[in-house]
């Protein structure tokens, strides 16, 4: 029930952000005269930041995307730490929550209400907010979606090249899409490591997300693929630094319902 509420809240907020972002097409170049609130106060400032850093680095827009991606990730790092701590606190309560589920296994309404009441009492006892892990994600989302728009709609980016690829064209050798997919897989694997249990949905997403990233990266300009690669590599380092002790203690998560060794 609580998981459904968290997912419902996240999907609702994603819908709001996508609606805001959808007011303007990613094919429309971003300018100071762009009319929408989203463009004027989110996308355009990020586009200007990319352009400013590019000028500082000798008109190198590829390097600018790398540096601005790292800067944004550093700025939202406190939110990520808060999210991971909340997730860790919820994970620590899983054994007690499982006992409550076994105690109130009947599916009738009265039993389920009792289960919900005792679960909430458990959260209050340990000072855990089950929705606390959602809010950092919601704050990050408009920044990351806005940065995606800024990369796609800053016309100067498409006119420059970096390393072996044109930023406005697809990677001709598919190197960036593959690296982006592998980095996504590794980052998710590290996020799941150290968890006592692993539900089937998490295991499925471990494989689905990298495949989706590869497919998207193949079909989008290389500038966006570069952003995904840098962002995921940063998150791998970030996750390892924050969750390092947990990863070393329990490198392979146990599947839910599996037998204990």
UniProtKB/Swiss-Prot annotation:
CDD domains for this protein:
5TM_YidC_Alb3
Q: What's the name of the protein?
A: Membrane protein insertase MisCA
Read off the Pfam families from this record. 60KD_IMP
Cytoplasm as a keyword? no
The encoding gene is misCA
Membrane-spanning residues where? 61-81, 131-151, 174-194, 204-224, 225-245
Keywords from the UniProt entry: Cell membrane, Chaperone, Lipoprotein, Membrane, Palmitate, Protein transport, Signal, Transmembrane, Transmembrane helix, Transport
Family, per entry? Belongs to the OXA1/ALB3/YidC family. Type 2 subfamily.
